[in-house]
Each structure stands twice: as structure tokens, then as C-alpha cells.
From Swiss-Prot:
Any single biological process term in GO: D-glycero-D-manno-heptose 7-phosphate biosynthetic process
Cofactor mode of binding and number, as noted: Binds 1 zinc ion per subunit.
Organism in which the protein naturally occurs: Geobacter metallireducens (strain ATCC 53774 / DSM 7210 / GS-15)
Quaternary structure (record): Homotetramer.
Sites where the protein binds substrate: N49, G50, G51, E62, N91, D92, S117, T118, S119, S122, Q169
Record field: catalytic activity: 2 D-sedoheptulose 7-phosphate = D-glycero-alpha-D-manno-heptose 7-phosphate + D-glycero-beta-D-manno-heptose 7-phosphate
Underlying gene: gmhA
EC number: 5.3.1.28
Broadest EC class assigned to this enzyme: isomerase
Keyword hit for Cytoplasm: yes
Keywords: Carbohydrate metabolism, Cytoplasm, Isomerase, Metal-binding, Zinc
Protein name: Phosphoheptose isomerase
Amino acid sequence: MNEEIMTQLRSHREVMEAVERELTPRIAAFAGMLVAALKGGKKLLVMGNGGSAADAQHFAAEIVGRFKMERRGLPAVALTTDTSILTAIGNDYGFDAVFRRQVEALADEGDVVVGLSTSGSSRNVYDALALANDRGCITVGLLGRDGGTLKDIVDLDVTVPSGDTPRIQEGHITIIHIVCDLVEKGLFK
């Protein structure tokens, strides 16, 4: 058992080192985009499926509530949280529309719309990001593996260099925490 634990921790370290080496400029760009949008009165919309849905909620919670700094709340919505909206859209339009329909209702030009997908190929995230692009939003993909189909349609892809879903998710939450920290410092320090 100890060997397996050490193997997983080693794998985690290797992915975090790759994130640092390969993604630092992209993480900085992501934070800069979000700071500029929030300064301009825009909002964050964020989405994902499964574990990525939980990460989307976590991201929105840190932005609306606070990360580390005592400050005013900032506008962010996780499109994964309202079961009535999700099931109404899913029932009437299908699962592929659950995020697209919310983007249609909530996204304004200049908002930052973030899609999380460990595969980079979630159809419902793709459709929502495509519509967000059409509406003049800034689109960001927190992705994994090779970035999948989402990599080609977002303004900025931040693709964790791993093919292992748990390591990708760990990369995503680390990136989210870094972005939240940079947003607070960029807006309130």
C-alpha cells in the first residue's frame, strides 16, 4: 500500500512540475483576462461535468465568496448547480444543451466563460463555448490530455499535460486556486 501511495504522490509531483514548466504563461494570461473582465463589470460563467462540475462550483464559490482576502463579492456563476434548470433543459432539449441554454440566457459580451473538461471533448461544454464565442465572450478551456476538440475553439486553452484523469483534476484545482489568488491581488491590492 505504501508503494502505491508513493507512486501516486510522485505522479502528482511530476504533473505539477509540468504545469509549472509548460503552463505558467497561460495561467498568467487567464488571470489577467479575468481581472480585466471583472474590472470592466463583467462576470465569470464556469461549467464542467462530473468532477469538473465540482471544480466549476469550487471556482465560482472562491470568486463570489472569497479566496484568501477579505473583500467584496465578485460576479461568478457555476452553470452546474441549479438542478431545476439542468433537469428542465435536459428534459426539454437534451443533455448536450444544459450549458448552452444557460450561456444563451446569462452570457454578455466580454464575460469570461470557462469550460472544464479532462478529455477536452465534452459535447455540452463545446456547444456552450461555441455560443459564448458567438456572443463575444472571452472563452477559456481548462482541459486535459491533448486538449481535444475544445482546444481549437477557446480563446485560451490551459491544458494540463497528463492523460490521467485524477492528475488532470488536481492540476485544474491548483490552477483555479492560483487564478483566484491572482484575481484578488489584481483587483484589491
